[in-house]
Amino acid sequence: MRFIVASDGHYGQPDTDFKQFHTDLISWVNREKMQKGVDFLFFNGDLIHDDPTLLYDFKNTISNLSVPFYVSRGNHDKVGLDVWQSTWGYPTNHSFAKGEYAFIIGDTSNEKGEYVCPDATWLKTEIAKHKDKKGIFVFLHITPAKWTVNGIECKEVIDLFENTPNIKAIFNGHDHDQDSTKIYGKKPYFFDGHFGGNWGTTYKGYRIVEIYEDSTWQSYQYNPTAAPVLNSFTGKS
């Protein structure tokens, strides 16, 4: 299995070339699909920039992708739960399975754009639902540890992850200037920089995750304009 995590496109942000940013990402992902294969793309929050009416335009823009995609809500996605559900067909807290692996999407904001901890009670229920899976990968826009300027402390959540053996990794967006791996206990937390917005890493890129048949997996950050592999991490499920 091979998937891509990209975040913080900020569609509609004033004084940014947001349309080109999205055109570029779509081109890069479609090229990856042709060259190496991509099972799905995950947009890890801040799909749009504050104005909820932008969501339709964003959805229309990414219809040019040649791969399936999933989304999480970021603090700039100031959209009501009903609009989110009707747009994407699932709520802001959602999980899905593909083969022997499960993927959990946790909401870390609200319609006001506040920073909130994921719903730990809901997470426990979803984790239990997928307890027999070989591995679980978690997507949260805002990192649940105060190890970045824009992170928030959610100790109940990180302890839950740490004590769940089949959780393999957590993916975070939000901090545009972070593209590395941070370790809490034994769990890796991956950041993917940004592909839009007006601040952050000097390049716009995304993160790739590859799960192999022998149950090993790796994740690395990718700069598609220069093609170096950055911050590679290898694990076993």
Sequence positions of predicted segments:
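Metal-dependent catalytic neighborhoods of phosphoester/phosphodiester hydrolases
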Residues: 16, 43-63, 78-89, 148-153, ...
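Surface-exposed cleft-lining segments at the edges of enzyme active sites
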Residues: 12-14, 47, 103-114, 144-147
